[in-house]
Amino acid sequence: MHSDELLVEILVEELPAQALLNEYKEMPKKLHALFNKRALEVGNIEIFYTPRRLCLLIKDFPLLTQETKEEFFGPPVKIACNHQDKTQGLNALGLGFYQKLGLKDHQYFQTAFKNNKEVLYHAKIHEKEPTKDLIMPIVLEFLEGLNFGKSMRWGNVEKSFIRPIHNICVLFNGEDFSGIEVKEYGFKTKQATKVHRQEGFDFIQVDSPKAYFEVLEKNHVILDPKKREAKILQEIKELETKHHIIVETDRDLLDEVVAITEYPSALLGEFDKAFLKLPSEIIITSMKENQRYFATFCQKSQEESPTLHNGFIVVSNAINKDKQKIILGNQKVLKARLSDAVFFYENDLKKPLDNAPLESVVFVQGLGTLKDKMERESIIAQYLTQKYISSLNMPLEKALELVKRAVQIAKADLLSEVVYEFSELQGIMGYYYALKQNENELVALSVKEQYLPASENAPLPSSVFSSIVALSLKLDSLFSLFSVGKIPSGSKDPFALRRLSFGLLKIIAHYGLEFDLKADLKNLFQKVGVYQSFDLEILEKFLLERFHNLIDCNPSIIRSVLNTNERDIVKIIQKVKALKRFLDDPKNAQKKELLFSAFKRLANINKDRNPNESSEFSTNLFKEPKEHALFEAFNAIKMNAFESLDSKIEAYFGLHAPLEEYFKSVLVMDKDIEIQKNRKNFLWGVYQSFLEIGDIKEIAI
């Protein structure tokens, strides 16, 4: 037998769910790195967790390490030997090399060739050794390498960890790992585990992985988080069927309740229907954030959206048979929470949105207050309203009035009691307060949707009107933060400007709005007129970089379009997609090399040209028939008013044949300087015309 099953359990006090879930994804990679470091080839690594334990399971863990060879290369023989002659013995430099390796005289004078030079050399063979001696050092190094964000010390221990560690149980090949003193964390190891607290508090001896799993299963500990999740979902499904409800199984919440339970049970509780007068988002958020409850909805017809039901799902870790007692306890706690929410909500309704003291809240140090931000956003919103009035289906005067009002009250809910309690409800509460205070519905909805999209695949604002308010917020944040040097770098993006920029591009693309990243940014910067001066090209470049996340295609195609003067967001996307369609077309996919060979040569000829250089040429200086042929084909394209971008691209790429013929028979670098210049100018004109679509030299096929 060359391998056996290895199980390691690290017994801890309750681990914080979010910290555990974040680091759990990195654990297999970190463990593999430690094994590779010691040249250990292991089978599949499984890592299980409950709130009180981390368990590492490897089905095929080798009994012995591999025999390895470690090579050491020293100085060249010429400078390491007396009189530069290896028959004359080693000098101080040569002796020093071997002495550092702890070698004796009779082992001197091994040499090898490296980089065509003979150098001093030694190969150290590491014999096979039992892996049992490596397990504890690896486990301790693994624990030290885990990053949960925060750690603590307890007693007089040497090392810190996220929570106190009480035992490390190692089960491998019948070896005895008990009684090992772990000074770092202040305990001696036991070949034992602990079970569900309601089953007992004492250690239970285990002598094999099989016995370990049997003890946990018998004592209400489901070690595998996937099995705990499956149990929760199955019980929720049964409750849905029995009570004719729909349960919203929020992914993040599901992960969290799996992480805080060892033997989960899904139970249905109820709250007073009177609380349903609250906006549903308050109830759902209160249940999720404060109590880790799942919301339930009334089951209606497929045509109707489900409405919130006065129930909730609590996932209990108790193995108490009296489930009703658990439910009643949770109902009592939720009642108190929702009573608080009613109090906050009713207090907020008494305060007019107009009177929110925005001037008392600093936006960002150096960028004024929320009132200052609101005033800047208002100027941007007025500009965008005039620009997009044709998409708003209302008179300009009315649109300007409504947009101004929307921006004026958009931040008022930030000072509300509900948002103070649940910051994720910003905008949403503003919507409800606006409706209650008889604001225009478009205005109220735009307040709700101003922060959209919240993530890459999240919903967008539902109208152009809401989009104007959302874009105003995003543009002001970008201008403001860039103007004071708060520019994302590396992985640091404290104000989430990358996500915000992506959302800005996505909104504009979705509604097909005209927005030029050079002209409109400059116009807005000047129109607002209060931002600190900074290079707008930095912001332009930052936004252009986001296109690589926005469009799913060959990055070189995106780069080719961005390398032109095109800065209209929608047109950039249209050109990228049109180029992608052309290159993905089966009839073109087979001849990409042929299509691009002439264009690449055209690009190389013009690579050093000044973009502002003249492209004037005269057909009177054409001497070769192929010059005229290329000119006629090119001129036909220039004169054509193409119905679509696709047909224009098709026509331009159709120039590859006359271009190939041109390069075969025409010497661009003619001895006659005037003819040479004319030919170069002509080809420069052809190349510049391509730049109306993309820079062909950037496309990698």
UniProtKB/Swiss-Prot annotation:
- Assigned GO CC terms: cytosol
Please provide the record's keywords in A-Z order: Aminoacyl-tRNA synthetase, ATP-binding, Cytoplasm, Ligase, Nucleotide-binding, Protein biosynthesis
A Pfam family found in this protein is tRNA_synt_2f
Q: Which domain of life is it from?
A: Bacteria
One molecular function GO term is: glycine-tRNA ligase activity
Q: Which GO terms describe its biological process?
A: glycyl-tRNA aminoacylation
InterPro entries per the UniProt record, alphabetical: Gly-tRNA-synth_bsu, Gly-tRNA-synth_heterodimer
- State its Enzyme Commission number(s): 6.1.1.14
Q: Where in the cell is it found?
A: Cytoplasm
The reaction(s) catalysed by this protein are: tRNA(Gly) + glycine + ATP = glycyl-tRNA(Gly) + AMP + diphosphate
What family does this belong to? Belongs to the class-II aminoacyl-tRNA synthetase family.
| Complex and partners | Tetramer of two alpha and two beta subunits.
Identify this protein by name.
Glycine--tRNA ligase beta subunit
